[in-house]
């Protein structure tokens, strides 16, 4: 069995997933699509870059991360079914997405969250010194958000599936009670949240695209990380918070039910009822660390019937 992973080159989480797969699973992987028995399409939005002759002649596993059915029009349906004709099995990273995908196809769907690299994401105990390195006071209450929040077409409109409006509402709620609050932002396209924070007079620090070791440090200085998405595939931030022991509260999206305690998952309008459970999240994430996090993927690929 030889597996080829489709390329994306978008400097996104999927690029890191692809690189880690090849690094830790070299004996069953190939960078040459001609040598592969299985093509793993990990970025379905660029599937057309894969030559159709290979899609026709090899087994195809396709990953999907989430569906925003509010934006799933005729064009999106046509693209899905154009790809579906070549797909043998599907992979999703959460049970929520599995339920969404099952409404579109009767093909086999396997739900396995992506692994998380504990060599990148880990707890740093000396928080005081860490904060000093960022020139942040120890008494500041830091709330983090490290995912894009703004639509790319105008760099103004909120990307509503990510819930940046919900994030702003919650930050305002916390700030009204605690003037020591500061927001820590990272990632691309944070325009909407930054504009809203400036309008509200809420202090923030923005670390745009920092190296992973710096991002790990940023997790470690937080008092709270907020996932406010309406629709989500992962996000990997849930795993990253779990391994760094960063306090996290999330809406019920993506892998949240698989990793977080049910009390750490909040409904919009009932945020005050949510409770942080760092140890529960940390313990839940252990099965997804490397190399354990590859096991279910290996089982999935071993179950694919390859014609000799």
Language-model region placement:
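N-terminal pre-catalytic "stem/leader" segment of glycosyltransferase-like enzymes
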Residues: 1-46
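Donor nucleotide-sugar binding/catalytic pocket of nucleotide-sugar-dependent glycosyltransferases
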Residues: 88-100, 106-125, 142, 146-147
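Conserved catalytic-core segment of nucleotide-activated headgroup transferases in glycan assembly
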Residues: 127, 132-133, 138-192
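Nucleotide-activated donor-binding/catalytic signature segment of Leloir-type glycosyltransferases, i.e.
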Residues: 187, 191-210, 216
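Short alpha-helical donor nucleotide-sugar binding micro-motif in glycosyltransferases
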Residues: 217-222
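Aromatic "clamp/platform" in nucleotide-sugar-dependent glycosyltransferases that forms part
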Residues: 230
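Short hydrophobic beta-strand element within catalytic cores of glycosyltransferases
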Residues: 247-250
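A charged, aromatic-enriched C-terminal amphipathic alpha-helix characteristic of glycosyltransferases
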Residues: 272-308
């Amino acid at each position: 069995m030889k597996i080829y992973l489709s390329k994306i080159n978008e400097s996104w989480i999927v690029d890191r997933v692809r690189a880690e797969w090849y690094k830790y699973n070299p004996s069953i992987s190939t960078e040459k699509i001609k040598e592969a028995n299985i093509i793993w399409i990990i970025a379905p939005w660029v599937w057309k870059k894969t030559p159709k002759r290979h899609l026709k002649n090899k087994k195809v596993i396709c990953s999907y991360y989430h569906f925003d059915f509010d934006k799933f029009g005729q064009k999106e349906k046509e693209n899905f079914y154009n790809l579906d004709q070549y797909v043998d099995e599907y992979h999703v990273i959460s049970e929520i997405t599995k339920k969404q995908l099952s409404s579109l196809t009767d093909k086999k769907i396997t739900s396995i969250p992506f692994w998380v690299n504990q060599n990148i994401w880990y707890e740093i105990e000396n928080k005081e010194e860490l904060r000093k390195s960022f020139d942040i006071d120890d008494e500041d209450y830091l709330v983090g958000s490290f995912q894009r929040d703004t639509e790319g077409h105008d760099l103004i409109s909120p990307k509503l599936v990510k819930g940046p409006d919900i994030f702003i509402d919650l930050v305002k709620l916390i700030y009204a009670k605690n003037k020591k609050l500061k927001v820590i932002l990272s990632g691309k396209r944070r325009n909407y949240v930054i504009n809203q924070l400036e309008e509200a007079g809420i202090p923030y620090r923005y670390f745009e695209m920092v190296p992973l070791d710096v991002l790990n440090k940023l997790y470690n200085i937080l008092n709270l990380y907020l996932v406010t998405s309406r629709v989500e595939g992962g996000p990997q931030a849930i795993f990253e918070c779990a391994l760094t022991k960063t306090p996290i509260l999330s809406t019920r999206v993506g892998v949240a039910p698989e990793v977080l305690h049910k009390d750490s998952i909040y409904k919009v309008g009932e945020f005050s009822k949510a409770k942080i459970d760092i140890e529960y999240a940390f313990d839940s994430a252990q099965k997804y660390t490397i190399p354990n996090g590859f096991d279910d993927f290996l089982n999935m690929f071993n179950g694919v019937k390859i014609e000799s």
